[in-house]
Every structure is written in structure tokens, then in C-alpha cells.
Amino acid sequence: MSAKEIKFGQDARSLILSGVNQLADAVKVTLGPKGRNVVIDRSFGAPLITKDGVSVAKEIELEEKFENMGAQLVKEVASKTSDVAGDGTTTATVLAQGIYREGVKLVTAGHNPMEIKRGIDKAVEAAVAYLQELSKPIKDHKEIAQVGTISANSDKTIGDIIAEAMEKVGKEGVITVEEAKAMETSLETVEGMQFDRGYLSPYFVTDAERMEAVMEDAMILIHDKKISNMRDMINILEAVAKQGRPLLIIAEDIEGEALATLVVNRLRGTLNVAAVKAPGFGDRRKAMLEDIAILTGGKVISEEVGFKLENATIDMLGNAKRIVIDKENSTIIDGAGSEVDIQGRVKQIRAQIEETKSDYDREKLQERLAKLVGGVAVVKVGAATETEMKEKKARVEDALHATRAAVEEGIVPGGGVALIRCIKAIESLDLPGEQNWGVNIVKRAMEEPLRQISANAGAEGSIVVNQVRGGADTYGFNAAADEYCDMIEAGIIDPTKVVRSALQNASSVAGLMLTTEACIAELPKEEAGGGMPGGMPGGMPGGMGGMGGMM
């Protein structure tokens, strides 16, 4: 085990503070509408240009071990806030720096750090309770667009696209972000349930121009095994032909005689039919087939539950208003499943999402959920260069997370104003002894985001803070326009969840750093190769002589 270096008390705290300051100072230049960019060198490709706090924080590693501890702890604040709320990483970093910096001064002056931490915790608890009071539920499309715009660094186009996507697929719908081939950022939506399996034969196509098989008021046969023998399907096909309605067959595979017969019937016009493979693999395939069955009001014809294909009847088939199948995807629109069954299935999938530990499984479950309740929207991000595309895509993802957070917990005035309003809630706290110092630290730290937004906009932070503190609840400083106004009316709003997470995560880590009395790190290793150049010339001739003797 290698030797360790230990630092105690003030020595340890001042080194941690130095690390915290280096990381926070690099991150906080990005805060607010007039925040600056940070350029990050990478070992491959072009440098990354970003205004995203967490991207800057993740790149920082300091050479000095004890300083690096401070930087890594604040990086944890930014990452956790990003994971929980999707935005607010820079605010969280600025708050953590403010709480720790003020706290270190008091601990150095001889105050008890444990009591200070208790005071910080109680102050944050009171502030969070006041935030919930201040919070208003999101009302309309316009407010969703405003939240998206603020999170995307005041890019109105992104805000509008995200609001439109949420309107189209609902609050539960899946919205994904992809890189576009063109310069423009656009939105594509898929209504109904879409899965990534196309027609098994181009002879099923009904619209030759678009190479699509389109079926109106269709029936759906869902089977979990391969179909290769036509005899198994004769009964059900005859029953469907009598109804005179189109039929979609979804099975593990359809091949040989069965596929050939379906194609011949389709070409002769005897039966309007199309066949696709079942989506997914293994257990996920079974679950997706069950989803399709519930959505369309049909049953999965499976021997596992006692249904054989040759005994299938019309009432086992699903129904849908419209089905569109192209070479790669099938879309079922307006299935005839009962609302009660669909909601039951949705509840079941939500429970699985809560329980699963795997990110991949969670993503797949969320996709299934979206297909049942709303649909899927894809935001295609376009830009002139790859560097701009990456930066823009990160902003779109931030904006998307923030709008989801706003829908979840509501909104508060933005621009650091909500935290300023929480100060009066914690001023009324009456705590014993040194805990009051903890309250004072939080009061001072809550001004920091507004100070930094003002400083980045070229204004004097202290003057702005005083002016805003004297105003009404929603009164604040619009840094983009350099004026004081009603923040809600100006569309400068933050999701409550983002502000809450930033404050809680910052105080949690800063409080732990304050109560640190010793730090341990590995000693830097001595370079072992110092004596080698001198040793080699002396060693080699002897060795060579030995070899000569052997020969």
C-alpha cells in the first residue's frame, strides 16, 4: 500500500476551497442570457464550445490532489442536478461555492461546523417549502415554450419546437433528439404505435408512389410463432374474407408456402392482406405483442396461453382505424382497445420503470409507454458545422429536460429571483446558538446566482440584488434586455424542480465539505527511472562477456 499525505483543519479546508473556486469560476461564466462560452480542448476532433455548466464541470481535473477533491465534490453537485432536473447545473455550482466559501470563513474564526451545518440544513428546508408556495402550475403551450427558450440559452426556436412536440405527443410521450442532415432544426411526429418492422414482401404495397401498404379499418392477427404452413391459417383467412376488411398479420416470421399464398391472394384481389415480423426479441417481443393486442383490442394467439392458430376466431383479432406499413416501419393508428385495459397496461409499465435498475431497460419501457399513451416526436437538430451541431444538441436536450421538470412541479420566476424571494422565508427562522450562522450563510449564498447573472451582463451585482429584494414577488432583473420587470410577464421562468434540486444538492455537498477536518491523498510517486542511464553502460559489457563464455 503506497504512503499517504494527510492535511488537517484549515490547511485541508483552504486547499478544498481553492479547488472549488477553480471549478466554479470556470463554470459560472456561462450563467444567464449574457453568459460566455467555454472552449474545451479534446484529445481528438475539434475543440468543444459550450455554454452548458455540467459539460464544463465534467472536463475539469486539477493536478494538486487536495484541490482536486474540492473540484470533484462540486462536480458531483452539477452532475446530480443535471441527472435529477436536467438543468440548473451552473446555479447549483454557484450556490455550492457561495455556501462553502462563507462557511470556511466562519469555521476559521472558531465557530462550530456541525452547528453551522444544522443551520444550513434547516434554512434550506424552509427555503424549499417557500419555493413550493411560490410555484405555479404550468398553464399553456406559451409557458412551456418560455421554459424551453430560457433553458436553451434564450433560443426561441428551440423553445417553440419543444412546446409543439409536447403538445403533439402529450406529457408522457417520448421526445427524442437527433442530428439532422440539413441546416434547419425541425420536428417530426409519429402518431399511434410505430415499431421498426416493415412489410415482408413489396407485393403488399398499395401506394406504389410512396411504397407504402395503407389499410383503412383493418383487422390484426397477432401470433408469437413462425407461420410457414398455409393450412394453419385457412380458417381465419376465410372468416376475414367474408367480412371484406383488410388484414395485417404480425408473427415471428412468415415464410415459404404461407407467404406465397398471401401474396397471390393479395395480387388477385381476393384478400387485402399484409404481413410483418413481430418487433423486438425474446421477452421484450412477447411484451410488445401484448401491448399491440391491448391497444387494438385483440389477443396474442400463443400456444403458451392455450390458443392455436388453426382454431383462431374473428373475435381474437385486433382492430385499427388505419395502418401504414413501409419498408422499415409499421404504424398502427387509432387502435380499438378498451381505455380501461390500456390504462391498466400503462400503470403496469410505469411500475416496471420505477423498479428497474438498468438505464437501457428503462429507456425501452419508456418507449413502450409512449407508444401506448401518446406517440413519438423527434427533434432533428440542424447546424452549419459539427461543432455548432453538438453544442445546439446539448442545449435542446437541456431545454427538453427543463420543460419536463416544469410540467412535473410547476414554475417560479427565473433569473435568480425565486431564490431571492426565499430569503424572507428563512429570515423568520429562530434557531438556537450557532445555527443562526448557517442561516446567514444560506441567505448570502442565495444572492449569488443573481449577482453572477448581473456580473455576466456587465451590471453591478450588489446594486441589482438590493433593487430586486425591494420589489414584489415576480419583480426581477432581465439581464438580456438590461432592465427591471415582471419576470413571469417577460417569460423569464425556471422550473421549480430545477431551482429546488440546485439548492438541495449544493447545500448537501457544501455542508459535508464544511464539516471536513482531515483529507487524505496518495503521495506523488518518485520517478523510479533516475539511475538507469548511468547503470546501463557498466552493466552491459559484463553481460556480453558472459555470453561470449557460453559460446
Swiss-Prot record:
Family the UniProt entry places it in: Belongs to the chaperonin (HSP60) family.
Reactions this protein catalyses: ATP + H2O + a folded polypeptide = ADP + phosphate + an unfolded polypeptide
Record function comment: Together with its co-chaperonin GroES, plays an essential role in assisting protein folding. The GroEL-GroES system forms a nano-cage that allows encapsulation of the non-native substrate proteins and provides a physical environment optimized to promote and accelerate protein folding.
Subunit structure: Forms a cylinder of 14 subunits composed of two heptameric rings stacked back-to-back. Interacts with the co-chaperonin GroES.
Coiled-coil portions: none
Record's keyword terms, sorted: ATP-binding, Chaperone, Cytoplasm, Isomerase, Nucleotide-binding
Cross-referenced NCBIfam families: GroEL (TIGR02348), PRK00013.1 (NF000592), PRK12849.1 (NF009487), PRK12850.1 (NF009488), PRK12851.1 (NF009489)
Compartment(s) where it occurs, according to its Swiss-Prot or TrEMBL record: Cytoplasm
E.C. no: 5.6.1.7
Domain of life: Bacteria
Binding site residues for ATP: 30-33, 51, 87-91, 415, 478-480, 494
Protein's UniProt keywords contain Cytoplasm: yes
Single GO term (MF): ATP-dependent protein folding chaperone
Name under which the protein is recorded: Chaperonin GroEL
Pfam families in the record: Cpn60_TCP1
Major place of residence: cytoplasm
Residues making up the signal peptide according to the UniProt record: none
